[in-house]
Amino acid sequence: MTAHPKVTLVTCKSMPNLFKGEEGLLDELAARGCDPQIKVWNDPDVDWSEAGMVVVRSVSDYASDRPAFLEWTKQLRRVQNSADVLNWNTDKHYLKELAALGMPTIPTNWLEPEQNLSKHQIHTRFPAFGEFVVKPAVSSGVRDIGRYTTVDTRQRQAAMRQVQGLLGEGRSVMMQRYVEEIDLHGEISLVFFNGLVSHAVEKRSALHPASVSDPAVHEAVVTAEAADSVAWKWGEEIRRVLHGYVRSRLGHDEQFLFNRVDLVPDGKGSFLVMEVSLVDADLYLGATPGALGNFADAISARAHW
């Protein structure tokens, strides 16, 4: 154990103070006997051998150069979450793997660049009715996500342009129906630290009809509190399945420092998993009393170990 272990919180150039609500994290860690600092992950002047325990936070630009980001994680002696987990979770194909395990995810059509799909072939993969969402498999936050409706010709054309543009850039594309319950009931995010649920956040969607997402627009937090029993039950089951899967995939047991599970009601008394965030998750630490301290406790416990 180290008396004052160094902790480096990692961000990107555009977010020098981490996520909103995390501004006090340095003080909280210092109060717990840590020696904290904030660094930008791709800053060439940083000596990462002196970084101590690295905690990945607001690296919202990783998707613009995922290979460089993953290469950076490999040089770190100690990083949370681990480099293997970051590798797995930075590509949303992980949802296909979780669905294969029986986890209730939103049904998805996957379009791959190597398929060389024609315009007609892409069009046949559009849903026949209702609203749908187009997003790249490698993305951060709500970047490059479009919401469209099938009944409007111009929107279908816009969706086609987005899909062709992403595929043309060599990016895998996800196409999902838009879950109407998001507008009716909102999304629920369950936040876990060291495997224990900390708090729950109910959000309104940042996606508006007939639009591509604006990275500057974030979900609106409606409520933040302890998870209710139903949401907690589902979140705990998802956490258990995810933990078991990652353990089998990596070949060793691993508990995540932080984990955010995004759920949406399916309209049938259950939930669908929208996303599992283990990389650059906004943990909504300023949304509810105690959340910032909970995260600082979790980091400090590992740093002092």
Language-model features: locations:
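Anionic group-transfer/hydrolysis microenvironments
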Residues: V59, A137, Y178-V179, V191, ...
